[in-house]
């Protein structure tokens, strides 16, 4: 029977059934939202809260997994540290054992450098102080051989005496040769000195003759120079007098003493002057400055008058504004007072009507509502 019904169902009926099911589902969702007092009163976003709770759980799970991972890593690191510590102890023990074996095998007491100080057989092994002059044990600090205590002392002494005799004979021969050479040198020096004396006398005569000639020529030259100097001084004095006269004339006729104002003009422009030549402002400039000062005074007086008028205008406006504000506040106060009186009268009349209505309801409605009465409400979302 059901298969026959499905066979004859039209698409329009299927759409109606789907729309009906959709409206029923929407109604149930609406009832769930409307009848939930918490969401309706507080206005909380349940979906957002659920998302936050879900995110918080995910975060807690992630933190828990991270802590567990850290704990596992710490346990693994502790195991590794224990293994490394045991290995270090074992290596230290092996190293100590190897050092002991090496000392016993290769560092025996008889191989030490200071063993000869504590050797019990030192006297038996001891050698004489020296066996020859070139003995390697015969050092400077050993003090076993001093100067002149070698084994071939007599042969060496005889050889030294022969050597001294030869040196003495050689010195005598050298002294005789040096004496003969000194005599020859003295004779040559005496002869050379006599020749130098003759040459010096001749040169002295020539120098005396030349000095006389030079003195005569110098005297003539000095005389001519003195005459030229006197003439030059006369010319210089004359030129100096002429220059002084020309300078005085130029100063008297120049711009400095005549106080020409044009001399202070600068080549950089008409607004610039030369400070060391400026003699002060001209009468036209002073008049121009006084005129500008008068104009500035008049302008300042005009600005002061405008400021005074502006201040008076602002004071007048401020007083008018304060007066208007005071009047507006008084008007508002009167309106509020009238409104409060009207509101009090309206509240009083409403209270009387409510009291009468309550009294009427108490007289008319005598039965009390039961639970069935309240269950018929809030059955739908509309």
UniProtKB/Swiss-Prot annotation:
InterPro entries, per database record: RIB43A (IPR008805)
Alphabetical keyword list: Cell projection, Cilium, Coiled coil, Cytoplasm, Cytoskeleton, Flagellum
Tissue expression as described in the entry: Expressed in airway epithelial cells.
Cellular component, GO annotation: axonemal A tubule inner sheath; axonemal microtubule; nucleus; sperm flagellum
GO BP annotations, alphabetical order: flagellated sperm motility
Residues forming coiled coils: 222-255
A Pfam family it matches: RIB43A
Cellular localisation: Cytoplasm, Cytoskeleton, Cilium axoneme; Cytoplasm, Cytoskeleton, Flagellum axoneme
Subcellular location, principal: cytoplasm
Subunit structure: Microtubule inner protein component of sperm flagellar doublet microtubules.
Function: Microtubule inner protein (MIP) part of the dynein-decorated doublet microtubules (DMTs) in cilia axoneme, which is required for motile cilia beating.
Listed PANTHER family: RIB43A-LIKE WITH COILED-COILS PROTEIN 2, RIB43A-RELATED
Family: Belongs to the RIB43A family.
Protein name: RIB43A-like with coiled-coils protein 2
Source species of the chain: Homo sapiens
